[in-house]
Regions:
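Non-catalytic terminal and connector segments of soluble metabolic enzymes
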Residues: 1-397
Length: 397
């Protein structure tokens, strides 16, 4: 059977209650589907009307159809019953029988009370004694069948550039508040790992709003530009220490000559080598980061290959709110994960100074520079998710 492309839409109320990380962790870990895209989505009334029309047309129990349509109409619009932002997190998955697996095995039925599904853990369904619905919160939505799936995918493609992408202006703050937007990149994660969800759950303690998200396969060219400032830092910070070079020289001289080489000669050459090798060492350490973040060896890649997406998967997020940069970096912890306080993200999930769970911008101007490099600055230009959907639908005809 051919692979199917489908979606999961995390609801505005789930984002409001900071359930995003828990739901995302389930979506990533409870199925063998491949995540192929992610974006934020704040639907217009026009989208909501058309989405409800797809629900009306699908074949399912009339009572459940009515419940879902009422929910979407009441909660997805900019003016909604909870008077909250209608931010949603939209994820795309691909794989064999993706539609059924996501709907039945991961998200679960409307009335699910079992904790092994998303709705069982994060959703609510309360009936009155007469069988009518008193309260319903599905936590996440997905398509019910292949026909409805294709209709809804086409709808997302149509409105992707209008209602999706970077949605900084959707969140409103009290007058006088000066919000910042900072970039976070969750570093390469394995398939079926709940790690990105776990980290997002910890970031939720900041009280900041997610206003952008992107599944990132960083190219070597992007990584080289993104981390470029580190080369100058590494040149001096990681410069080979003369005393260590001297130690190696003495060992080599001792094994080669039957006489002792004067200390003045050893020390003189050690100082020279330290200066001569600092550029080479800085680039070598820099390339380790590039390979880790892209999954590709920059020393072996051709110029053409350096522009292609890497094999390593990262998740880039935009957090917005007052003092966003400080709040994110505080809960993240220091670059060296072993030096962080207990309870910090890098202390819990980091391995070393490079594999330290996540990157976070250290200043507003750097956040702007970094966002532009990975195309998470605005909604202009090419829309990869729209192309992904359109290519799939064309092949499905």
């Amino acid at each position: 059977m051919a692979d199917e492309l489908t979606y999961a839409l995390i609801t505005p109320y789930s984002l409001l209650k900071s359930r995003t990380g828990g739901i995302l962790g389930r979506l990533l870990s409870l199925t063998n589907l491949e995540i192929v895209g992610a974006t934020m989505f704040a639907p217009s009334d026009a989208f909501v009307d058309k989405y409800c029309a797809t629900l009306e047309e699908q074949v399912t129990k009339p009572a459940w159809k009515k419940v879902m349509m009422n929910y979407v109409n009441s909660n997805f619009r900019k003016e909604n019953k909870f008077r909250i932002t209608n931010r949603m997190l939209l994820l795309f998955f691909r794989g064999d029988q993706a539609i059924a697996k996501l709907k039945d095995d991961v998200i679960g039925p409307i009335t699910s009370f079992q904790g092994h599904t998303i709705r069982g853990s994060f959703g609510d369904y309360v009936e009155r004694s007469d069988g009518t619905v008193e309260y319903f919160e599905p936590a996440a939505l997905t398509s019910a069948d292949p026909v409805t799936n294709n209709k809804q995918l086409a709808l997302f493609a149509e409105y992707m550039t209008k209602d999706g992408g970077v949605i900084e202006d959707v969140v409103k703050f009290p007058e006088g508040t000066k919000p910042e937007t900072t970039l976070v990149i969750l570093k390469p994660f394995e398939e079926r790992s709940p790690l990105p969800g776990n980290i997002i759950d910890m970031f939720s303690r900041t009280g900041l709003y997610i206003v952008g998200i992107k599944l990132l396969r960083m190219s070597i060219a992007q990584a080289d530009e993104f981390y470029g400032p580190l080369v100058d830092i590494f040149r001096e910070k990681l410069k080979p220490k003369p005393e260590k070079i001297a130690e190696k020289l003495r060992e080599g001289f001792k094994a080669t000559f039957s006489f002792e080489v004067p200390a003045a000669i050893v020390n003189n050459h050690s100082e020279q080598l330290s200066e001569q090798l600092k550029d080479m060492n800085a680039r070598h350490e820099f390339n380790k980061i590039i390979q880790y973040m892209t999954g590709l060896d920059p020393e072996k890649a051709s110029q053409a290959d350096k522009a292609k997406p890497g094999t390593a998967r990262c998740l880039a997020l935009l957090y917005r709110g007052p003092d966003a940069i400080l709040k994110i970096r505080n809960i993240l912890g220091p670059t060296n994960s072993k030096q962080g306080e207990p309870g910090k993200i890098r202390r819990i999930y980091g391995e070393d100074i490079m594999k330290n769970a996540a990157h976070a911008s250290d200043a507003v101007e750097n956040a702007e520079r970094e966002r532009k490099i990975i195309s998470l600055w605005d909604n202009k230009g090419r829309c990869e998710l729209k192309e992904l959907i359109e290519n799939y639908l064309q092949k499905s005809r």
